A protein has these predicted regions:
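SDR active-site strand-loop-helix element
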Residues: 11, 36, 76-80, 115-121, ...
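NAD(P)H-binding glycine-rich loop region in Rossmannoid oxidoreductase-like domains
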Residues: 59-96
Length: 269
């Protein structure tokens, strides 16, 4: 059973989503956190300001540290990834988004630790197969960039595994915006960039449409506020144990969309 003294791992803990996950866990009374990331950027360091945790570990040292320290981990939020959609060196995505995630999965499986990991709506590509979080379409999805491909490759791998954690969920985040994305530069959300453009210039530049069915600025996206994403992640941790009992609303292992379910245009924003 998870209680307020339980040890919880958050990867990507200095980043956009991970730092807010750590902060929300603190708000709920969890302070025995193991934070994993690359802690080499001053702006990311600001994301950890006043966060309470037991220890923080450099990403590439994490598994060696686990072998030595053998902590009694009760839950893992694997939120770290290379999220740059303009990074076209697939080897980087393979290492960070596939291989590293497989090591997290295997560790959780071996030590009987429930796992929530970040997938992405980028796996849906141009949406030609729709956006349903149906496991049957995952093999046929056609992501548009190496980031989306790597996320989909791990999703496919996870679904194929016979050995698995006691509970696992891959969460396909849609277009997330909110606090602590200042360090992301060009990869910050459209809402972040739009806000600062309006403050500076009095207007916002919208993306040109490359589809004849949509005029410029009328492209549709599902924008979801970061704190809503965090609450959903936490909900899985709170409720996964019901999945092993006879509760009539038991949570199944698998891959889930995390969005509002409603698309909005850039002009509307």
């Amino acid at each position: 059973m998870i209680n307020k003294k339980s040890t919880i791992v958050v990867t990507g803990a200095a980043g956009f989503i991970g730092s807010c996950m750590a902060g929300y866990l603190n708000e709920q009374g969890f302070e025995n956190l193991i934070l994993v990331d690359e802690f080499d950027e001053d702006e990311k360091e600001l994301n950890l300001h006043e966060k309470k945790y037991a220890v923080r570990i450099e990403r590439e040292n994490f598994f060696d540290w686990l072998d030595i320290e053998k902590p009694d981990i009760k839950f893992v939020f694997h939120l770290g990834a290379r999220t740059d959609t303009t990074e076209f060196d697939y080897a980087i995505h393979q290492h960070l988004n596939v291989d590293y995630s497989q090591k997290i999965w295997n560790y959780c499986t071996k030590h009987n630790i429930p796992l929530v990991y970040a997938s992405s709506a980028a796996t849906y590509g141009s949406g030609e197969l729709g956006y349903a979080d149906d496991h049957e379409i995952i093999e046929r999805l056609q992501p548009l960039n190496p980031y989306g491909i790597s996320k989909n490759e791990f999703d496919k791998w996870a679904l194929q595994q016979e050995s698995k954690p006691p509970f696992w969920a891959g969460l396909k985040f849609f277009n997330v915006y909110g606090p602590n994305e200042y360090h992301k530069a060009r990869m910050a959300s459209m809402i972040f960039h739009g806000y600062h453009q309006i403050k500076k210039d009095g207007f916002v530049k919208l993306f040109k449409s490359h589809k004849k069915d949509f005029n410029d600025g009328e492209q549709l996206r599902d924008f979801i506020y970061l704190k809503d994403v965090i609450k959903m992640c936490y909900w899985f941790m709170e409720n996964w144990q019901q999945a092993t009992g006879n509760w009539k609303q038991a949570i199944s292992n698998g891959i889930y969309n995390i969005g509002t379910g409603k698309a909005r245009s850039f002009k509307d924003l």
